[in-house]
Amino acid sequence: MLNGLFFAALILYFIATVLELGGMVFKKEKVTRLAWWLFVAGALCNTVYLVARGIIAQRLPLSNQFEFATAFAWGVAVMLIGLQVKSRAEWMRAAAMPMAFLILSYAALQPREITELMPALKSAWFGLHIGSAVFSYAAFVLAGCGGLRWLLQEKKLPKAQLAQLDYLCYRLVALGFLLLTVVILAGAIWAEQAWSAFWTWDPKETWALITWILYAIYLHLRMRKKLSGKVMAWFVVIAVPVVLFTFVGVNTLLPGLHSYG
């Protein structure tokens, strides 16, 4: 049953993505409406899967690459649903739905066995540190989706709508940046308790810091209005691969203290 929920979410995300893109290209509103509700159903399966896995494991399901990727896809989906409810974010769906599907597809390639937490992970900081990372990464990915929409629709959307889109990307980055700050600070305190050192320049720590600095630069430039909306859109789009490398690439290519995942 547990695997069935996971693959139901994966299949629903895939079908929703195909229908959303097809409906957008051929301007079929009924198709995109169906795509949306299938995506919501996928997010529900994703949610139930994580809850069930957590109950079975008797811990938060965030301890390895598979669990984090599954939660990451869920974070993208849940935040997109929240944006849709609050801001009618149809413009972001065609980019965000494929991201949720691709992240969950990556999870499907990882070992799915439920294992006991390593002693170093049995900490009160576990949920705050990793849970904040889930939503931080999701916010950055959605900001990138918004930036991509800005670039693709620059000549078609009125200036007021482009400005609104730019502001939403800014708010998503600000949220992601705040959460990433929590990730780094909580991780430093946790590391001092587990390994007697606040900072070890572990590859994951280093790339998290690089990501933090990158988005700090974006926020500085955006608040000072130093660059155009187009440059800012390119910034958040190009920053997404850095986020994904911090998540996937570091664990795969650069072994360190975080290699347990």
Language model region names:
Residues 1-261:
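Polytopic transmembrane helical bundles with strong interfacial aromatic enrichment
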